[in-house]
């Protein structure tokens, strides 16, 4: 755990050079959950060494799974029997990703409990999409005071209609269907990058899946999976977006290599309309043969506020996790930007923390905020918000703010971003770590 770790930033410096996009946090945690389906050895390649992954490794080890690092690869070997009673409750409550264990564990355990999950603190995040999706397969979920009780008498293939295009609910449904013999269909599924990643992994395990990249997935489930496999995790669009925002706000020319372009096209379109100058080249596929990559060459640009509200939508819309970056980008854009963060009850409230750096914001309600630019950002000491993306935009703002800033208790950033200090230093940022 890194609860007492801080970042100290001497801001106002230009960045330059090339940064490679890190591998996907959300893809990695989904595949850690999916690995429980396999009775054979799973090698996950290019796994980001981040706190969210560390927590899930602790959970896996606590229930008897052997997990070992080999450089940036994880070697995962299941036990003969899952010891769910010994689950590391502290680690499990640190991450909402634990919910995705339901779809895998139900094939080994007819009845079990999971601790209530945590992760980002963004208001109520209902498990109802999971409950309604999985009950079609014969899986019952009860939310108790401090844990979830999961049980099933008989698993059956099913047609599932998701009333909410949830990434994790889609993944849970995929994992549930994977080891139920027969054909299952998931309608109105998320097609986001971590869902496509999970589909690619399940295909490698021998599960037939049609419709990858669309909103209707057809799964040809198999009774048992026992294969020794290797699978490489793809690049993270939210990691690329962090460096796009950092380059824009510091007025820098930077290249982001191996960016997953299909999950950044709407973001780049908006930024282009705001005045960002950039070029794309070197198209290729990631090792999973699904994710399309390009290099993004950003130029220092003068931005104007986007004339319409900026809001996120399920893929192929602007990514929900990338929306917060537009708040800090708005501080350097000429004019007033309206951001509508409709997904979470209070994430927009965290955007007002930019005021500590000299931004001018007006919070209209818990979902809508106006940001006036350009602002002359100044150094400050800020306690890191407990939610990942709001925390990162404070860091981006501090990179541009002249003077010495301190961002305290940065665990929430290290949950999702790998080697962020070293990678920023490589681009010329003056940033160091310190402890309380």
What are the roles of these predicted feature ranges?
Residues 1-436:
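Short, structured segments at the rim of ligand-binding sites
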């Amino acid at each position: 755990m890194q609860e007492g770790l801080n970042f100290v930033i001497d801001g106002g410096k230009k960045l330059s050079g090339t940064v490679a996009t890190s591998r996907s946090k959300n893809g990695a945690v989904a595949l850690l959950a999916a690995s429980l389906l396999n009775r054979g050895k799973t090698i996950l390649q290019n796994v980001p060494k981040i706190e969210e992954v560390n927590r899930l490794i602790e959970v896996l080890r606590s229930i008897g799974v052997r997990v070992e690092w080999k450089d940036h690869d994880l070697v995962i070997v299941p036990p003969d029997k899952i010891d769910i009673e010994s689950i590391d409750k502290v680690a499990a409550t640190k991450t909402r990703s634990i919910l995705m264990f339901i779809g895998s564990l139900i094939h080994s355990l007819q009845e079990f409990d999971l601790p209530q999950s945590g992760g980002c603190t963004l208001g109520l995040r209902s498990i109802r999409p999971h409950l309604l999706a999985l009950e079609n397969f014969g899986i019952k979920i009860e939310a108790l005071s401090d844990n979830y009780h999961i049980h099933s008498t008989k698993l059956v293939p099913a047609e599932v209609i998701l009333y909410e295009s949830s990434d994790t609910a889609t993944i849970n449904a995929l994992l549930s269907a994977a080891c139920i013999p027969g054909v299952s269909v998931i309608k109105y599924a998320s097609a986001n990058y971590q869902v496509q990643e999970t589909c690619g992994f399940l295909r490698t395990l021998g599960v037939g899946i049609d419709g990858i990249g669309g909103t209707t997935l057809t799964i040809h489930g198999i009774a048992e999976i026992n294969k020794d496999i290797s699978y490489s995790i793809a690049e993270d669009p939210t990691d690329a977006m962090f460096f796009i925002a950092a380059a824009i706000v510091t007025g820098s020319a930077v290249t982001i290599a191996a960016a997953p372009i299909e999950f950044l096209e709407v973001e780049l379109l908006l930024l282009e309309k705001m005045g960002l100058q950039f070029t794309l080249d070197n198209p290729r596929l990631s090792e999973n043969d699904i994710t399309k990559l390009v290099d993004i060459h950003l130029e220092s640009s003068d931005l104007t506020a986007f004339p319409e509200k900026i809001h996120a939508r399920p893929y192929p819309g602007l990514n929900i996790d990338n929306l917060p970056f537009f708040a800090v980008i708005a501080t350097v854009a000429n004019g007033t930007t309206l951001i509508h963060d409709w997904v979470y009850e209070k994430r927009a409230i965290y955007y007002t923390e930019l005021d500590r750096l000299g931004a001018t914001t007006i919070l209209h309600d818990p979902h809508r905020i106006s940001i006036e630019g350009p602002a002359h950002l100044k150094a400050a000491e800020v306690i890191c918000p407990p939610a990942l993306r709001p925390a990162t935009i404070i860091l981006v703002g501090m990179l541009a703010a002249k003077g010495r800033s301190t961002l305290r208790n940065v665990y929430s950033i290290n949950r999702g971003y790998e080697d962020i200090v070293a990678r920023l230093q490589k681009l010329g940022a003056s940033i160091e770590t310190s402890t309380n």
